[in-house]
Amino acid sequence: MTDFRTHPDPSEWNDYVDYESTSWPKKDRRSYWIIPSICFNCESACGIIAYVDKQTLQVRKIEGNPVHPGSRGRTCAKGVVTPNQLEDPDRILYPLKREGPRGSGEWKRVTWDEALTDIAGRIRQAIVEDRRHELMYHVGRPGEDGYVNRVLQAWGVDGHNSHTNVCSSSARLGHFLWTGADRPSPDHANARTILLLSSHLESGHYFNPHAQRIIEGKSRGATLIVVDPRLSNTSAKADLWLPAKPGSEGALLLAIARYLVETGKYNREFVRRWVNWETYLEASWPELPRTFEGFEIALKQEYELFTPEYAEIETGIPAERIREAAEAIAAAGTAFSTHSWRAAASGHLWGWQITRCLYLLVVLMGAIGERGGVNLHHTNKFVPRPYNPPPPPEYWNELLFPKEFPLAFFEMSFLLPHFLKEGRGRVDTYFTRVYNPLWTNPDGFTWMEVLQDESKIGCHVALTPIWSETAWFSDYVLPMGLGTERHDTMSQETHAGRWLGFRQPVRRVAMQKQGKAVGTTYEANPGEVWEEAEFWIALSWKIDPDGRLGIRKYFESPYRPGEKITLDEYFGWMFENSVPGLPDAAARENLTPLQFMRKYGAFQVDAVAYSKAHEQPVESGGVEIDGVRVAGFNTPSRKLEFVSMTLAEWGWPEHAIPRYVPGQVYWRDLDRDADEFDLLPNFRLPTLIHTRSPVKWLYEISHDNPLWISTEDAARLGVAAGDLVKVRTAIGYFVTRAWVTEGLCSGVVAMSHHLGRWRLHEDRGGARAASSLVTIRRKGDGKYEMRQIHGAMPFKSDDPDSARVWWSDVGVHQNLTFPVQPDPVSGMHCWHQRVRVEKADRDDRYGDVFVDTEESHRLYKEWMAKTRPAPGPDGTRRPMWFDRPLRPVPDAYKV
């Protein structure tokens, strides 16, 4: 009988033989090294294996790594296209330096040493002159755990900026206020009921590993409940689809919570033991007895409004469906899993309260740390300790965490251009790494204005594997490696286990297998494409060549004192000293830990891991539960905080418990007679990811982002499928095509945020198969018009497929027309927009965009007025128990 296998066995990876498909029917045997790495095209950290041709060293194919515990041999379309990225005719292969004005498109090739010397000189001068606060590193999806934070700490710089506040900060805050952990880790595979507040099955965080386990759980009989105003592919898989009106999810969740409490179908003993109900009664219900029975009375009165019938009015979901969902959750018991990352939480003002309401259901069911329930992320994510950790920064960077946002999760990154326009500071040296704020963030033309202003940003260094709209406005474009061209460690909370993955430059590894000496990764990669891990070491030595600044010592070898560390030494030390079980596993195969990770690309730290740390007995600290002192949760009360006294003490007492609070686009406030809609602009496609995926195979699948509009609304507007429509926002408009569907709530329009890439030059500045050529005309007073000249077209290159590009549409860039809308508590940009939709005018063309940046800045000030600034009750900038990247010394918290 034939032995069918999905992957070659690791024992074959050093010399795998396959037939060359392009030689068929001739049997042309080719030999490959199969070298594992980690995909770099989202944050799931899925394992991949690269088939490296032994003759040409070309990466011929990418598949999933079968020994990777998170992804288990599977990869999505974004992983498979890695060879497209490697061979992209429009990728950047050599370091470039700007010659003309920023944005002019005039570049010259420079050496790595020239770039390092210039950039290091600026940084050294800023450090010597005590201007560390003018150094900033701004990253999108990092694809690594902790390496660059260590670099910034070594420099003494509080300069880590991120994309979190256009991604997940409201969900993070909602989770953190409950447990002291800002991310959940659902055990979908073993759940009896799974509740998703998004199209999580097809495009969520973490897409591939979670999708596998959701379907696994469903195949074992789990009930899948999906709350999504769109009939997404996830909704289509649901046993119960609940298309709630956007922003009303809190009403739905509280109705379910009320039902569970009223019927007694909740885990009463867990709630009694682990929720800070005593504090809640003392603060809000002094007239009730300080007993759990008193808390139950208070809870029922607190949420008495939220009957299924009330929720039906608010959400549009029939009351019977709400009861059905509640019964499914009750039936699951502790095997109830759920997840919230973006979607509703990221879309709305007070979106973190939606997450608070969602987690209330987890708490009521006692599903924390249980099989089929929800873990805390740090139970399942493993971050190894590096050698010689530097001390924390000694100051607080107000451009990252301004006083107005003491509770933000995390840096107020998308407000940076407005802060600089207001004169709050200046950035001397600004690194963007795999981050494209001009395109990804709202209000991109304000970013463009600031990026062109050298008085606000002295030097912009774009660390990027590809061209982007933002890189076009930089001083240096430094090409960095993709998923098979770089070193990183990475782990994610994908399931109820713990693992560590290792990304590595596969051509470098292959050359070393050939016996060739490779000094730096750019000697092995195409052109002179480098990797950040080596780049930061080289740059740090340039900044502090003699060690007098106290920086160089953190980049010296732990094995060769005084000499520059190599990446083999950096990761070798980590794998030898910081990964439990790895040295023993390696020794069983007569390998070093580094050799083991190079061979397999991943290591399973724990096969099964559930969050039980809160139950561990302790001698001091912690919290007393039924007469036993235990560790508890990482909150001030050491309990699950139904009532957050932090919120109450830091100026938000009305939000101290989970509440339903309508957001900035409330369906009752829309003027439907004036054709106002709620624009849902933040849903994702399973084939694309922000700005890393403009490659031929993906865009052949997904290359347009029409405006979803319900059949009912389209008929009222007189719009048919394919018609041009103009969508007016608070600061401008964009023109796109309508897609008429029954799969969307009335009063809502929706548009995927992945597409609409553009470039300003015909043959550089963007992927020609995935971007449109545009003109941008400044009309004065902050007004800009963008018009597409043409979309994707066939073109000649070394890749014969470039002449076969058959699609022309590459979508419309909607984010340019969105004002910044920061949630005053979490700092999250609230993505949903109140818009007016109309048929396009005669002179309108597909892809037209108009923006008024002066109006945008005025609206920025309106939203800033909603904040309640620090200091808090203890005179600090931020609660000491709150997480933040690059946490400074305690004295820096003082205002």
Question: Predicted regions span which residues?
Answer:
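N-terminal export/assembly segments and adjacent metallocofactor-ligating motifs
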Residues: 1-266, 293, 309, 318, ...
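Short helix-loop-beta junction
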Residues: 153-158, 363-364, 453
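Long, low-complexity segments enriched in small/aliphatic residues
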Residues: 353, 561-695, 886, 893
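Non-catalytic alpha/beta scaffold blocks inside enzyme catalytic domains
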Residues: 170-350, 355, 365-370, 378-379, ...
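A residue-level signal for beta-strand positions that form part of recognition/binding surfaces
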Residues: 32, 59, 73, 134, ...
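Short Gly/Pro-enriched turn/cap motifs at secondary-structure boundaries
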Residues: 30, 37-41, 351, 631, ...
